[in-house]
């Protein structure tokens, strides 16, 4: 069994986080799942949601976008489009993005190609607001 669990959160732009953690909870596309040291290996898709982890008994939160997670007994690598630490999220900006997406969606039919992009933008904004509210 592994002595420690390393978490890496990686985006196309940067390594958002890399350190030893006690546990991590990931928003998988089939629902959230928790990982502790010694976990069985798996590969999962990641959905828009809240990723949380514990370091020295303190909980940390990130708003993540879609991607993948690779889990081994010693390491969790989360590769996502975006990852924002709760403390760094501009909640007011996220609220403006939510309002903008809702207004634009109201003008379109669900069959419109732009509608799905706006729906994804709305989901990201709502997630960012929720994660920012954790602090």
Curated annotation (Swiss-Prot):
Domain of life where this protein originates: Bacteria
Pfam families for this protein: ATP-synt_DE, ATP-synt_DE_N
Gene Ontology MF term list: ATP binding; proton-transporting ATP synthase activity, rotational mechanism
CC per GO annotation: plasma membrane; proton-transporting ATP synthase complex
Keyword Cell inner membrane part of the UniProt annotation: yes
Localization per record: Cell inner membrane
Assembly with partners or alone: F-type ATPases have 2 components, CF(1) - the catalytic core - and CF(0) - the membrane proton channel. CF(1) has five subunits: alpha(3), beta(3), gamma(1), delta(1), epsilon(1). CF(0) has three main subunits: a, b and c.
Alphabetical list of PANTHER family matching this protein: ATP SYNTHASE DELTA/EPSILON CHAIN, ATP SYNTHASE EPSILON CHAIN, CHLOROPLASTIC
Protein's UniProt name: ATP synthase epsilon chain
Highest classification ranks of the organism: Bacteria, Pseudomonadati, Thermodesulfobacteriota, Syntrophia, Syntrophales
């Amino acid at each position: 069994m592994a002595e420690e669990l390393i978490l890496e959160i990686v985006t196309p732009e940067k390594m958002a986080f890399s350190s030893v953690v006690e546990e991590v909870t990931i928003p998988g596309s089939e629902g959230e799942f928790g990982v502790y040291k010694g976990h069985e290996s798996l590969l999962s898709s990641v959905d828009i949601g809240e990723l949380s982890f514990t370091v020295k008994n303190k909980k940390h939160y990130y708003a993540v976008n879609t991607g993948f997670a690779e889990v081994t007994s010693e390491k969790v690598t989360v590769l996502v489009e975006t990852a924002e630490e709760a403390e760094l999220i501009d909640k007011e900006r996220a609220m403006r993005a939510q309002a903008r997406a809702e207004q634009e969606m109201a003008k379109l039919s669900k069959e419109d190609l732009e509608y799905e992009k706006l729906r994804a933008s709305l989901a990201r904004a709502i997630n960012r607001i929720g994660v920012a509210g954790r602090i």
